[in-house]
Regions:
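Structured catalytic core of nucleotide-sugar glycosyltransferases
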Residues: 4-14, 56-65, 69, 83, ...
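Active-site metal-binding motif and surrounding structural segment of the metallo-beta-lactamase
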Residues: 32-78
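Active-site environment of divalent metal-dependent phosphoester hydrolases
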Residues: 58-62, 84-85, 121-122, 144-147, ...
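Short, basic/aromatic-enriched C-terminal tail that caps enzymatic domains
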Residues: 238-257
Length: 257
């Protein structure tokens, strides 16, 4: 199994997960033309995709999903709540699969386990992917951790973990008070310290890759996110990857130890 990012942040998110002949796009917050260009940088075209998974209905995650699916005849998986809250444009999608937020399902060579998260959307989920040998946990939009989130992510071989903001930078910044409250709230986004606390609650003995994701360009820095997560693992800060808003990150492969 391997994974890569097309970009991560408030202006758009998309993550690729591949196992065997199966390639899934997790979220698509970029327009179709930009998505095609970003896929090309990773050596892929839309025709190589097995489908699109959607975590929730916010535009930075779903904004380009329906157009890409319609143009390239791709299936889309999402929860009932996300489907109900999603913007218009679903009619041309060849196949929409509505998923239970806690029931695993199979797409080709990937087993996918969704799990609910605290976020200000209708029925948001994040996912753990498995190819039968390795597990990749992805959690990029949640305001707080829960025991269930911890159970889902513990023991993963790779993690893509939200480090949205530095609390001091957010409070000193120029966002209006209501937006600061939303971001820092229980149903908003994890700050660096909260992400580190979540990481510290997990069994990380098999961890091969750790990526800090969904960083705010105004209220965080890559160095601060790396420092927070590396402090938990006792590893070099450079070992922690960061998903860039524009470039994402290249392919990361999971290997048998």
């Amino acid at each position: 199994m391997r994974f890569a990012s097309l970009g991560s942040g408030s202006r758009g998110n998309a993550l690729l997960v591949e196992a065997g002949a199966t390639r899934l796009l997790l979220d698509c917050g970029f327009g179709p033309r930009e998505t095609v260009a970003k896929l090309g940088r990773l050596g892929l075209a839309p025709e190589d995709l097995s489908g699109i998974l959607v975590t929730h209905e916010h535009s930075d995650h779903i904004g380009g999903a329906f157009k890409l699916a319609t143009r390239h005849r791709l299936a889309v998986w999402m929860t009932h709540g996300t489907f109900a809250a999603a913007p218009q444009g679903r009619s041309g999608i060849p196949r929409v699969e509505l998923i239970d937020s806690q029931q695993s399902f199979q797409v080709g060579d990937l087993e996918i386990q969704p799990f609910p998260v605290p976020h200000d959307a209708r029925e948001p989920v994040q996912f753990v992917f498995s190819d039968g040998r390795h597990r990749l946990g992805v959690v990029t939009d949640l305001g707080s951790s829960t025991p269930h989130v911890q159970r889902m992510l513990t023991g993963c071989d790779a993690l893509v973990l939200e480090c949205n903001h530095d609390e001091d930078m957010l409070q000193r910044g120029n966002y209006p008070p209501h937006l600061k409250r939303r971001i820092a709230g229980r149903f908003g986004h994890l700050d660096n310290a909260a992400a580190a606390a979540l990481l510290s609650a997990l069994d990380n003995c098999k961890l091969q890759h750790l990526i800090a994701a969904h960083l705010s360009q105004q209220n965080n820095t890559a160095d601060l996110a790396r420092k927070a997560l590396a402090g938990v693992l006792g590893c070099a800060e450079a070992w922690v990857g960061v998903a860039d808003q524009d470039e994402g990150f290249g392919w990361r492969a999971l290997s048998l130890c």
